């Protein structure tokens, strides 16, 4: 598999249930969550020793952006490390609340919608070459991303005027544009704002904001892995059938509501195609591409998962993927509970289970319960996730950032970092600019660290 820099940014939903008379707003709860961060970072926007960025986003949503990763399992591991870091903040915040006489349970949800209809995202980042034609990448990717929910949606019980329906995607109802430079106002599928966080003459960052937040490690692996294969093909000039959509926004919603994958959507040229038709085209090209360029274990794993997910939808046999793909895992859980208790899909108890699936608190969240019972498959291990809370990826620029932060903190020195800059806030204001995200060794950074 061709080397590429990946990153995932995840916004988390926050809520709190209180035991006594005292109540706090979501903003106040979020501030309690970040109090420990602010105490050492003097800000609610910090970079961590593992190279990641942690900050409080608009609307009291904690956001975790993984460090630069160049391997899919590494990316999944660092994405999960973000959950563990936020879980630690949650436990600390509950302790603070208790110490101040405010009894309460804080909940952090790795999902994309709250009960008030607000949406928050999971953004994927892919480094692409500046030389390629970005508009072609967007044109080819758009139909793939609109239909990708078949293989990696998080699943959601949606209450509609005609009753409750089970949907493939949480995010689909909240996307309003195909390609745009905005992220919050219009919520496009692909964000075109040109911020490469790298050498702008060589690289561009593809920012995909249509995806669901995934609890399943394997779903995250497939989500990013399949998109990476499509990108690889576009970069190497593979030709695709034209599946340009007449109305991508209508299509993404219609596809989300159809678990059969067979409902057709209108294409720009007047033809019609189903989500399965479109995904089969991309999948078939990917199989041929990997066979031509030479296979590798990760490409084989992605193609196996991708193919089985499409087979599961086509044959309506979700057992093919109900240990690996979030929407199928959740559907199995909800259906078993419904059948056991004789409940309608619209039951508040089902809505509660739907939400609890995304609770990141171990021992309380339903996905964690399934994982402990060995009812879901994994892509990484607990020991690797624990290590990734403090250790940056060793093969990318993240190592330089993480090593610098750790050394500066150990030396008690004041510093400032972002994705490309490492700066000592001393009289000399020494700064190192790290423009190559693939570079994990840099003599300038080593000299800066040795001077501490």
UniProtKB/Swiss-Prot annotation:
Q: What is its EC number?
A: 6.3.1.19
A biological process (GO) of this protein is: modification-dependent protein catabolic process
Any single Pfam family the record assigns to this protein? Pup_ligase
Q: Which reaction does it catalyse?
A: ATP + [prokaryotic ubiquitin-like protein]-L-glutamate + [protein]-L-lysine = ADP + phosphate + N(6)-([prokaryotic ubiquitin-like protein]-gamma-L-glutamyl)-[protein]-L-lysine
**NCBIfam families reported in the protein's UniProt record:** pupylate_PafA
Misc remark for this entry? The reaction mechanism probably proceeds via the activation of Pup by phosphorylation of its C-terminal glutamate, which is then subject to nucleophilic attack by the substrate lysine, resulting in an isopeptide bond and the release of phosphate as a good leaving group.
This chain belongs to the protein called Pup--protein ligase
Species of the source: Saccharopolyspora erythraea (strain ATCC 11635 / DSM 40517 / JCM 4748 / NBRC 13426 / NCIMB 8594 / NRRL 2338)
Taxonomic lineage of the native organism: Bacteria, Bacillati, Actinomycetota, Actinomycetes, Pseudonocardiales
Name of the gene: pafA
